[in-house]
Amino acid sequence: MTKEKIVLAYSGGLDTSVAVKWLQDKYNYDVIAVALDVGEGKDLDFVKKKALDVGAIKSYVIDAKNLFAEEYVLPALQANLLYEGKYPLISALSRPLISKILVDIAEEEGAVAVAHGCTGKGNDQVRFDVSFTALNPNLKIVAPVREWAMSREEEIEYAKSHGIPIPINLDSPYSIDQNLWGRSNECGILEDPWAEAPKDAYDLTIDPVDAPEDPEVIQITFKKGKPVSIDGKEMPLDELILQLNTIAGKHGVGRIDHVENRLVGIKSREIYEAPAATTLIAAHQELEALTLPREVAEFKPTIEQKLAQTVYYGLWYSPLTEALQSFIEKTQEHVSGTVKVKLYKGHAQVIGRESENSLYDFDLATYNKADAFDHDAALGFIKLWGLPTQVHSAVNGPQGKKSIEKVDLEVKEAVKP
């Protein structure tokens, strides 16, 4: 009798390696393993072989860096997405892509189910499950780590008894996830929000204290909100991001220490490193300040905040996310130009910006003799602008009486000696 197939998101680590055998034992599935490289630098050949060695009937490995950068990271950059004002959604952006590829392969292979290696405590289980359901509600979802209720020690014993290799870094106290948009780290000493993260918690960035004494100035060029070159050298977006991770990381840029509100209702202390994301978002925001009309610039952060929340909550494939992204995409039509950024000891400071679509008019802004601003027009504008306040005060009395009591002031007459 032919076994049913399940497609597993496979990382090559202990959890998903054990999951291959567990899915065979528990559900009698034929397991198809799928591993993606979204910029963490996986040895895809090694991962492919390991999946087959631990029992998968087929192993897919996919270099998805460019797809991830273009279809998931770029919309996030154009929206300046920062969950709770700090987290650039590193892991949250990769989950919908992984989900999409797993569903595509499941449909191609005639599989009846998909699986992931998430625990029952984090956000990723929600992101995967909701994405799977949105993309194909007929697929069964299995989460081995969430179901098997094994302790770490029991999991290791299970692996040993089934001939599954134990990773050499298993003793690391940290739980790490990485892609080209950054690196997230939790667990161990990091669970104490009072404790400073030790040096070994970081990998992409140098300690700002130890960063070079001389700043480095780079120029980033954007076309319609998309970064296309660094210092005049054009390159694909995924390569640009990875290169900028190296450039900004050596100056200690992009360290984020954040206590965030997880979707599942708990608070979690996370250490993020996002050198490229931090630099690009700062540059992109400044270019928008130069090119967006005032009303758009004032309203866009409202959309950004909601979009960051929907992505964090695992709602990438929702009508709301699609609608919000449509607004963001429209705002990027004229966000083209070059931004000059100084990288120095943990900071990415924008020190210059230029654009053919700039709404900055020097002749209107200057205070020198070239001033073209119509100062006389200001009088009429001020009168009309303040008219509602004037009418309200005439009807209800001056607002000042309601907030500040009249006080006796000692007045000294100024007498010319």
Swiss-Prot record:
It is found in: Cytoplasm. SUPFAM superfamilies: Adenine nucleotide alpha hydrolases-like (SSF52402), Argininosuccinate synthetase, C-terminal domain (SSF69864). Belongs to the argininosuccinate synthase family. Type 1 subfamily. Its main location: cytoplasm. PROSITE patterns: ARGININOSUCCIN_SYN_1, ARGININOSUCCIN_SYN_2. GO terms for biological process: argininosuccinate metabolic process; L-arginine biosynthetic process; urea cycle. Disulfide bonds: none annotated. Its EC number is 6.3.4.5. ATP binds at residues 9-17, 117. GO terms for molecular function: argininosuccinate synthase activity; ATP binding. Homotetramer. The keyword Membrane does not apply. One of its GO terms (cellular component) is cytoplasm. Pathway: Amino-acid biosynthesis; L-arginine biosynthesis; L-arginine from L-ornithine and carbamoyl phosphate: step 2/3. The keyword Nucleotide-binding applies. Keywords: Amino-acid biosynthesis, Arginine biosynthesis, ATP-binding, Cytoplasm, Ligase, Nucleotide-binding. L-citrulline binds at residues 87, 123, 127, 175, 184, 260, 272. This is Argininosuccinate synthase. NCBIfam families: argG, PRK00509.1.
